[in-house]
From Swiss-Prot:
Documented EC number(s): 3.4.21.105
Protein name as catalogued: Rhomboid-type serine protease B
Predominant subcellular localization, coarse grouping: membrane
Membrane-topology annotation of the record: Multi-pass membrane protein
Family of this protein: Belongs to the peptidase S54 family.
Subcellular location: Membrane
Key words of the record: Hydrolase, Membrane, Protease, Serine protease, Transmembrane, Transmembrane helix
Gene name as annotated: rbdB
Length: 272
């Protein structure tokens, strides 16, 4: 039997993957590490991480407000965590590179976690009269997709499906519906709540929750964050400015720019 001269090439370049991982900004790295840590903690059988940190409407009270921040970091099983990490990393990395590390911390520990949770609790508990617990970083995935969809809509209002032109801002809604249909045990309401907040973020309505750049620069200078923290993204290192977006193409006839369907990307579940 003949011995092959060489192994078949890998479907990805390990060197490029390693280079990409080494360039990840600070907050993105910390989020990935916390998700991994919670998954490892869930492997033990003494204490249930999911029961402790999930977003469970009937469990929210004065002493359990931490759930509004812990649920995006917790996952049910390796596959749930792994796929969400793959989908979240490029989106979160881009956000931090565009807006800075301190802004990313302020938003994701604050309104970008608590606002989707608030909508979910309001509808799930007081309208649907249910108590379904949800966990998973897909809340941030759909939120960032919603924000990106709004920014894309401003420069490329439509994508073409045959002869039909569909607004690009609807793409996260299609993704949400498809995930709910084809991926079991997902929370359509949780994903939809995240998309709504993502739309508000993309439209600029959440600017009020972002600390002024003057204050951010003072904190960075006072603590020397850029010099002390590796991979820290300062206010002055931001890629596109706070809420700006660079146009990717010249204007088409009639002001409409088609966007390929590949914009939909990869999305995964929110919930056990």
């Amino acid at each position: 039997m003949a011995i092959p001269a060489a192994l078949p090439p890998l479907p990805f370049n390990p060197t490029r993957v390693r280079s990409y991982m080494l360039r990840l900004p600070l907050f993105t790295r910390l989020v990935l590490l916390v998700i991994l840590a919670f998954w490892l903690l869930e492997l033990q059988t003494i204490w249930s991480v999911v029961q402790w940190g999930s977003l469970t409407p009937n469990e929210i009270g004065i002493g359990s407000m931490y759930r509004l921040n812990t649920y995006p970091f917790i996952h049910v099983g390796f596959f749930h965590a792994f796929v969400n990490l793959l989908a979240l990393t490029p989106l979160l990395e881009r956000f931090e590179a565009e807006h800075g590390t301190l802004t990313a911390v302020a938003l994701f520990i604050g309104p970008l976690s608590t606002f989707p949770a608030g909508i979910y609790i309001l509808v799930e508990k007081f309208i649907l009269r249910s108590n379904t617990a949800v966990v998973g970083a897909s809340v941030w995935i759909f939120l960032l997709l919603g924000s990106e969809a709004i920014k894309t809509f401003k420069s490329n209002p439509y994508f073409s499906l045959g002869t039909t032109k569909i607004p690009t801002w609807t793409s996260p809604l299609f993704a949400c519906a498809l995930v709910s249909i084809f991926v079991p045990n997902t929370s359509f309401l949780g994903h939809l709540s995240a998309i709504i907040i993502g739309y508000l973020l993309g439209l600029g309505y959440l600017k009020v929750f972002v600390p002024p750049e003057k204050i951010l620069r003072w904190i960075e200078g006072k603590l020397n964050l850029l010099g002390r923290l590796p991979h820290y993204v300062s206010v002055d290192q931001k890629t596109y400015g706070r809420y700006g977006v660079l146009p990717t193409a010249t204007a088409a006839v009639g002001g409409e720019r088609p966007t390929p369907l590949s914009y939909l990307g990869t999305n995964q579940r929110l919930g056990p």
